[in-house]
Structure formats: structure tokens, C-alpha cells
Amino acid sequence: MGYSYNPKSLCADEFINDEEILETLAFADAHKNDVQMCYDILEKCKPHLHPASEHGAMITHREASVLLACEDAGVNEAIKQLAHDIKQAYYGNRIVLFAPLYLSNYCVNSCLYCPYHAKNREIPRRKLTQDEIRAEVIALQDMGHKRLAIEAGEDPKHNPIEYILESMDTIYSIKHKNGAIRRVNVNIAATTVDEYRMLKKAEIGTYILFQETYNKEGYKRLHPTGPKSDYNWHTEAMDRAMEGGIDDVGLGVLFGLESYRYEFAGLIMHAEHLEAVHGVGPHTISVPRVKPAMDIDPDVFDNGIPDEMFEKIIALIRITVPYTGMIISTRESQTVRERALRYGISQISGGSRTSVGGYTEQARPHDTEQFDVSDQRTLDDVVSWLIDQEHVPSFCTACYRAGRTGDRFMSFCKSGQILNYCHPNALVTLAEYLTDYAKPDTSQKGFALIERELQKVEDEKRRRQCAEAISAVVHKGERDLRF
């Protein structure tokens, strides 16, 4: 059966259409040396430098693919500069911090790139009890984390939806000293509309599901057995999640599995599809790369991308989907993460453990890790590093709890109004962290940064309110103040 490209369709074969992607790549090859076309495409993006006063059209997946294929040094430098400037216009210098929490590595799937695959007899299988989850969360709160992304393999017997829901309730219930987890994002396998409704009722933050690869034939090869082997079921999951009432969804591909140009086009088409059908694009886009792990050698995948191209992909996602939050994890090294922050990344993990029960172990356990962690710094080290670069480490979760989600969040973000909330909230939550958890030198330079950043809050009333909230945090012990 032949399929035609239709971004408004609910059929994965139509909104991620193979023929359209191949035609897109051919178009990009035909025009990659047309420097004037490339600059004209970049010019279309410039209204996004002023989101409060101008509403520029998004460039298409074809136009973005031309830019990706372009090898002209001047164009590539212009791409990075524009991406930096657009990120500043939408998100400023704030960097949201989070941590993953692995609940269970039981899995019935056979993904060839993941050590949790069912045939791996070497990995110890483990599932956290609710008491163990409490201990993990207390350890995370004692670091200073306020936002978690929970992860679990797909296993109806060991990890049913009831286990995920109970775990979310446990996480939200824990208030240790001044600690609290205020937003729980969920990264679990594609499921039904009814189960998405249950996650919504349990106060999910963002539902995250990595596509892994948009190449259907490659997807089938990489997922030979298990529920995840159904490409359409997996690819159409975000539509079911939004039908189930989940406002915020997060996309991502695992770069290195298939051609990065194919994946990039598919990722942008998925974002276009969500906009076309639901009026709301992805709340976040993640950019993981295949990394070593037990039973996994990334060198067997011959589509790896060098750091320079990886940075260009990040920059082009920022230009093409300017409103989205962009996430990079501790899969990447400090050096790569530092450069990625310039070109579009707005969220990073810190102090992460990618093993089940990893936060309460004295020594870092490697035998249950999903992937090797490249950036092994503590959360305080990451916060200190961000401050040194004049980034504002943010632990804010205010939008989610104030109802600024889905189309409401997007209207604030696309108009630039979100800056009136996010910047002050970032400063208040940073003050919480510096008061409760930071090392003395981190605290000292962090409060100096807050003083400098307060002067950048343009609205005089909001600047005064922000200063008062910070004072209440530091001197009165108040917590969870937000705008």
C-alpha cells in the first residue's frame, strides 16, 4: 500500500512519510551549495529573535534539511550564531536542571542498542520497592533536585501502569527537610489512551518517548521482538498521549542508529505534525547519541556523528523549533555539553545515575546502568560550572503547577512573555538551592550572579517582587515561592 505525506494524518506512515523524507534529502543535496538560498532560509527565521513583537513562520523540514546539508563555512557559522540568539530570545540564559530516576530494568523488548533487552542474561534485573524509591528520592532531594524524569523498561508483569502511578505518588509525597520533587516527567513505553489518562490524573509533567529512529525499515531491524517492535504503535504514541489529556510531550531520536539526515528530517516532521493536529508542538526535544553500555558497543552502529555535526543539529533544531525546550544528558561529556548550551540546549541533567538504585549506593553501580555516564560531576559541580559561564541554574517547576502547560505554555513562550515568569522563578529557585545545598564557594558566586541578574528583570514591579521572594527564601526560610 502506498502512502502520501500528510502532516495532519494520524497514521505514522503519512505524517512521517518515507517518500517525503527521501525527496527532502534529494532536495537538500540539490541545493546544499546554493549559498544564497541558505541565507534566505536563515532570514525567514530572524523574526524569532523578537518573539514579543513579531511572529515569524517556522521554516519547513525541507528548508532545515538544506541548511543541514550545506557545507559553506559562512552559512554554518551564521546557523550557530542565529541559534544562540534565538535561544536567548526565548529562554535567556537559564538552564533547567533535572535528574533521571531509574525504577526498573525489567524489559520484554529486544532493542539492539539497549542493555536492558530481554536476551541480556548478564545484567542483574532489579525493580525498586516503594521504600527504595523513597530512599532514592531523599538522596536526590539532598542534592537539591526538584525535577525528575522517571524511567522504566517495558514489562507488563514487573512494571505495569499501576506500579508507575504508585511510584509517582510516592515521589510527590516525600518532603525531606526543605526538599520536594515538584515535577515528575515520565519516560515509559508507548501505551493506551486510557493509561495516558491515568498518568494525567497522577499529575505527570512531560511524557517523554524517544522515537529511537524514524526509518521504518531500520526500526524493524533494531526492534526484532516485543511490543516496541510495532513501529506505528510507537510512532503514534504522542497523539494518543495528547488525546488522553497530557499537555506536554517530549520527542527525541537516538542519533547514531540510522542516517542523521533522515532522523533530523523525521524529527522536524514529527514536530510539524503535532503542531498541525494539536496546535501544540513538542514541549521538549532530546538529542541523545548511542553510547557504550553492558552488552552494547556503539561502534557496531556505523551512523555515528562527530561532535561538530552534533552541534549543528542542535543549532538547527533550535532554529526550526524555536519554542521547544532542548535536553542533553550526561551521556555527553562536559566539553560537548558546554558547547551545546551555546547553540540551543535549555535543560541538562546533573549528578545523574543511570542504574536502578544508583543514588543510594556508596559506589557508583555499573552493572545495571542503561548507558555509560560521560559527565560524572556532582550536581553542585554542575551548578558551579553553569554560574561560571553566566548561565542561571534553574530548578523552576512553576509553569506546570500554575497551569501554563500545552497550548497555554506555547502561547506564553511563542510571544516571549514566558521570560516575565521564568527568569524571576529561576532566580528564586536558585536562591533555594544556594541556601539549602550549595558548597560555600558555589553559594557565594551564585548570590553574586543573582544580584546581577535581578537588574535584568525589566518590569520594576516584578523585579521588586522577585527581590522580596529571594529575601524571604534566605532570611525567613520560606520555600516554593513562584510567579
Feature-to-residue mapping (PLM):
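Canonical Radical SAM [4Fe-4S] cluster-binding loop centered on the CxxxCxxC motif
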Residues: 91-92, 96-132
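Radical SAM enzyme core and accessory elements
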Residues: 1-47, 52, 338-346, 352-483
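An N-cap/entry alpha-helix motif that binds or orients negatively charged groups
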Residues: 50, 54-95
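Core AdoMet radical
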Residues: 118-134, 139-242, 247-257, 279-286, ...
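Short glycine-enriched, charge-decorated loop/helix-capping segments at active-site entrances
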Residues: 222-228, 299-303, 368
